[in-house]
Amino acid sequence: MKRFFIGILLIGAFLILSSCNNEELFSLSKDNRLVFSTDTLSLDTLFSNTSSSTYEFWLYNRNAKGVRLASVKLANGNQKGFRVNVNGIPLSNNNGFRVNDIPVYHGDSLCVFVEATAPSLDVIKPQEFDDEVVFTLESGVEQRVKLRAWSWQATHIDRLEVANDTIIDSPQRPILCSRGIKIHEGATLTIKGGTTIYFNHDAGIDVLGRLSIEGESEKRVLLRGSRLDKIFSNLPYDRVSGQWQGLHFYGSSYQNTLSYVDIRGCFNGIVCDSSDINRVKMKLEQATIHNCQGYGVRLVNCKAELINAQLSNTLHNCLSVEGADVLLNACTLAQYYPFDSSRGEALHISSQYQPTHLSVLNSIVTGFADEQIKLPSKDSSNLSYQFSNSLLRMTKPKDRDLIHYKDVIFESTKDTINMGENLFIKVDNEVLDYDFHLKNKAFVIGKADKNSCPQIDHDGIRRKSVPDIGAFEHH
């Protein structure tokens, strides 16, 4: 029992001494300051009246003693649109947008979380808005971290129902679309050159009527996801697939024309449902469909033309032809999808719907895998296909099948190291950056058929008298 009471006394004495020592650990010296992971936190660009993702920075006490924060506050209160949380405590109306008396022990650190909602500004270009987080130490020393973001005034669309002929013409101001666009049967939506539409994750374009995209060589139309920030420091969300829903043409939709348009970062780029194969469902010219988490273009029992189109990097097939009448001329199909090794082919042909007719002229079909063209393995008596003046990454067919191939270059399937590097300017799977223009001395230069090849290329540049295979003419 005596030993028990002695133990209690020793523990009590230790706690008293520890309490005294803790009090002594906090310094009032102006020389003892905090170290911050950054002096300026940039939140990138936000559309007006939209909120950012959560950012963070850290503060560290590397002094020999503790430092106490007398207060932490925003220099402008809550007037600039920033929201701050200090070590789990939000700066809110409940605490007057400041927190007080926060100890930072020797060797300890605190995390500060920051979000922002961009203000509405009546200007064309993105405008900076800023604030500062002010840290006042118990010694009276004041330290600050600057917060910066940019607000981009956008026209907001929330579930646009196109029941009558409608024109979207917005070359100067971006359009932010939530919950998608639906074009009803009998109506036409025309999107003029220079327009950019940013789609939220739940949004896309459903076409029961008709869609006309009228881009120009110097004023392309851009359809992409709405995330303007980065998933990593070197990787913008714009390079990540599956950011929005893409374009869906239903059975009642015909005579769709899409020219000089870039469609990227979506789930399915374009899906065309089954319809009358004697009527043109879609004509795609001078277009790019890139980085899709589903199909690039899926054509189901319909009639379509793809001219000077780049279809690249898709989880499923870049182009899937499922019982259709399809013309492919001067296109580049490049399957370098980086996110999944079970990616589909650059070109997949199915005889599920019959008959199927496919004509491929002056085109590149290539990618990671040895076999980038998938033909039906079963009876294909109703399948008619022809490849002419094209580069195909596939094993050379048997003699009896060579009738379907005229003046074709079969890309060596032994090339498993420099895939794409012999053809294209850039195939960078580290930072997901690609440029499918032809590089100098690419072996497809001058190999297209001048009689059937379009006179201009994907970029609207006139082709040479001896043109190149693929969507892009080398200059």
Predicted regions: what is each one?
Residues 21-27, 34-45, 50-52, 56-58, ...:
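Beta-strand/loop edge motif enriched in small/polar residues
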Residues 74-97:
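Short, solvent-exposed loop/linker segments at beta-strand-coil boundaries, enriched for Pro/Gly
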Residues 52-54, 64-69:
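Short acidic/proline- and small/hydrophobic-mixed sequence motifs that coincide with surface turns
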Residues 1-9:
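Bacterial N-terminal signal peptides that target proteins for export
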